């Protein structure tokens, strides 16, 4: 057995593939279309290679899974998982943190707008 980085990477990818419940070729794709559009937006071809999209998808799924597990560990001390647990984990990555805060603020604005619309609609019915 070789101690080269390539050999280590190949053996770790084999162990990851062996640890999954589905074969590598038949696994369910979750974000293929969205990732193709994102890759195109970041300068890739309009129709990137399926292998490239699958690789990016594997990286994204692994990142989200790891982040969720870490947030769950933090939240288990309180007994429940909160959005703040995720914000705490990405606190050092300012672009991600700012984007999450922006999206959370937009979510709150939409919630308030829906609530105001529902109240107006109920007043019209009465």
Swiss-Prot record:
It holds the Pfam family TFIID-18kDa. One of its GO terms (molecular function) is protein heterodimerization activity. Residues 30-74 form the Histone-fold domain. Residues 1-18 have a biased composition (Low complexity). GO terms for biological process: embryo development ending in seed dormancy; endosperm development; seed development; transcription by RNA polymerase II. Disruption phenotype: Embryo lethal when homozygote. The keyword Transcription applies. One of its GO terms (cellular component) is nucleus. TAFs are components of the transcription factor IID (TFIID) complex that is essential for mediating regulation of RNA polymerase transcription. May be involved in polycomb repressive complex 2 (PRC2) mediated repression. Belongs to the TAF13 family. Component of the TFIID complex. TFIID is composed of TATA binding protein (TBP) and a number of TBP-associated factors (TAFs) whose MWs range from 14-217 kDa. Interacts with TAF4B, TAF8, TAF9, TAF10, TAF11, TAF12, TAF12B and TAF14. Interacts with the members of the polycomb repressive complex 2 (PRC2) MEA and EZA1. This is Transcription initiation factor TFIID subunit 13. It comes from Arabidopsis thaliana. The gene is TAF13.
């Amino acid at each position: 057995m070789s101690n080269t980085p390539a050999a280590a990477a190949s053996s770790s990818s084999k162990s990851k593939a062996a640890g999954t419940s589905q074969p590598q070729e038949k696994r369910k794709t979750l974000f293929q279309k969205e990732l193709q559009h994102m890759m195109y937006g970041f300068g890739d071809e309009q129709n990137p290679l399926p292998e490239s999209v699958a690789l990016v998808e594997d990286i994204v799924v692994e990142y989200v899974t790891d982040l969720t597990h870490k947030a769950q560990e933090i939240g288990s001390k309180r007994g429940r998982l909160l959005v703040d647990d995720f914000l705490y984990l990405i606190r050092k990555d300012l672009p991600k943190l700012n984007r999450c805060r922006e999206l959370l603020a937009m979510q709150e604005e939409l919630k308030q707008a829906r609530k105001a619309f529902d109240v107006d609609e109920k007043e019209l019915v009465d």
